[in-house]
Amino acid sequence: MNTFKELSNLKGRRALVTGATGNLGKVIANTLAELGADLMLVDQPGSDFDSLTAQLTERWGVAITHHFCDLELQIQRTELMAQVNKSSSGLNILVNNAAFVGTSDLTGWNVPFEQQTLATWRRALELNLTAIFDLCQGFTPMLQAAEGASIINIASTYGMFAPVWSLYAGTTMGNPAAYGASKGGLIQFTRWLATTLAPAVRVNCISPGGIWRNQPDEFVTRYAARTPMKRMATEGDMRGAVAYFACDLSNYVTGQNLAVDGGWGVW
C-alpha cells in the first residue's frame, strides 16, 4: 500500500493551468508545483508570466513553460493545442480555470437582466464552456497516454444555486445570467466527460463559493451571515481540493463536483 506522501507526489507529471496569472490561477499553480508537478502556464496576451515563473521556479524548482493564448478565440486555442501536442513531455493534468467572473469588466455583463447583452452572453459561454470543451477534446489523446491523468474544471456554486438577490441590495454588484448558465453547463459537462473518458482519465469539478475580493462591506457581512463557516472563501481555501483531484489520492474518484463553499449549499 502506498503512503499518503507517495500518493500526493506529482513529481514527473506535467500540468497545464489556464488563467494561470489570475488570483486563483496563481494559487493553483503554486499548489501543483509544491507537489512536484512541472507546469505549463496559459493566460491571455499581455499577462505577466515572468514574476510568477521566477517565484515558482525559485520556491519549488519545477520546470515551467508559458503560453499566451486568448482562449475566447478558437484559432488561438488550436495553436496552443498544436504547440503542446508537439512537445515530448506529455500532459498528465489539465486545469480549466480561465473564465469570465462576476466582476469581469464587460459591456452588458454586471448589469440588470434587461441590460445584459446577447453578445456578452455568447462571449461568456465561449470562454467559460466552449473553450473547455475544445481543450478537453484536443488534449484527450495526450491525457489518455499519461499516468494518473486528471482533468479539473473550476466551476462555481452559482452553477449549482440561483443567486440570493438580497445579498446585493444597496451595492453596485450583480450576478450575470451567463455566468451561472456557463458554470452549470460546466458541471454537467464534467459528469458527461467523466463517463466518456473513464477509466483512462479522471474528470472532476471544483465549485468555489464566494471568494473575498474587496466586495462592499454590506455584501461581505450578509454573505458571511448566511454561510455556516461565517466568512467568505479565499483562493487558498481551494488548495486542498486542487491537490486532491490532481494526485493519486483521488484515483478512484471521477465525475464529482466538490463545492468548497463553507457550507453555503447545505441550507
Feature roles, as predicted:
Residues G148, A198-R202, V253-G255:
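Short, small/polar-rich loop/turn modules that mediate ligand/substrate recognition or access, typified
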Residues R14, T21-G22:
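Conserved glycine-rich cofactor-binding loop
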Residues N97-W109, G263:
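Conserved NAD(P)H cofactor-binding loop of Rossmann-fold oxidoreductase domains
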Residues E114, L118-T120, Q144, I152-A198, ...:
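Catalytic loop of short-chain dehydrogenase/reductase
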Residues L35-S51:
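Conserved glycine-rich Rossmann-like NAD(P)H-binding loop of the short-chain dehydrogenase/reductase
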Residues N2-L7, P163-S166, G170, A243, ...:
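Short C-terminal tail/terminal secondary-structure segment
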